[in-house]
Amino acid sequence: MKALLILVLITLVTCNAMIDKLVSNSKYSSKKSTLKIIGNLLFDHGYEASWVAGVLANIFHEGTIGKFESSAYISHPEKEPQYLKYMDQLYGYRTKYSNKIITDVSIHELDSLLVKLKAANWKKGKFGLGCVQWTGGRTYNLFQKYKSECGGRDKITLDEATAAEGKMVIGEFTSGYKYIYDEWKKNNPNKNAPGAAYNAGHIICMKYEVPADTANKAKKRGQTAQEMFSVMTK
């Protein structure tokens, strides 16, 4: 038992050191806090470094804890997605939520908005939120975790939002999206190979994040995952 405990402690120290290496790299400094929190959480739940790199690569390209999707396509307004135009026009999204952090908005008002969008089955209005930029029903599920963490208050703290998003990521990868991890694990027997990190970043983009221009972004995120893995393990 004592030997097992020592092994667990050594593993945790090693994993924490990997994340510290990653976030100390200036290339990833813009998402330092988010990458550190989610990365350590994934390691705490036993995920391999190459898989962690794949998740973090997608988060690096996708979002920040508690942050709303921006609808401010100032230079190229023609590129603004239709669902964000709808949100801007009907709900004043650009002013109330666009590019803001969840700690700065009213939880009660956001609750009311999400109930309306859910009732319409997300057919016209939705928005990305959080480190994964969850949309539609997944935004609603995340919001329920926000509400649970803040205990009914109208404002949520960053620590509470972080806890909620951590539970969301782990919850998805251990339930409805577990098949993605299982598929990756089956097809990548050598988890310590850089290629395993690339494949993690790629499949997570293709089947978990699914952004616009998915195929091209999956290649980029696979490359980022491989680079992150190299930084973490050197």
Locate predicted features.
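Short, functionally critical alpha-helical segments immediately adjacent to catalytic or ligand/cofactor-binding
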Residues: 49-66, 169, 203-205
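Active-site or metal-binding loop neighborhoods of secreted/extracellular toxin and effector enzymes
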Residues: 184-234
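Peptidoglycan-targeting cell-wall enzymes and recognition modules
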Residues: 19-37, 60-196
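Short, well-structured alpha-helical segments
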Residues: 36-39, 52-57, 198-202, 222
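Amphipathic alpha-helical segments within well-ordered protein domains
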Residues: 39-43, 170, 205
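Helix-boundary and loop/linker segments of multi-pass membrane transporters
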Residues: 42-46, 122
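Cleavable N-terminal signal peptides of Sec/SRP-targeted secreted and luminal proteins
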Residues: 2-15
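Hydrophobic, Leu/Ile/Phe/Ala-enriched alpha-helical segments that form helix-helix packing faces
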Residues: 42, 172-173, 229-232
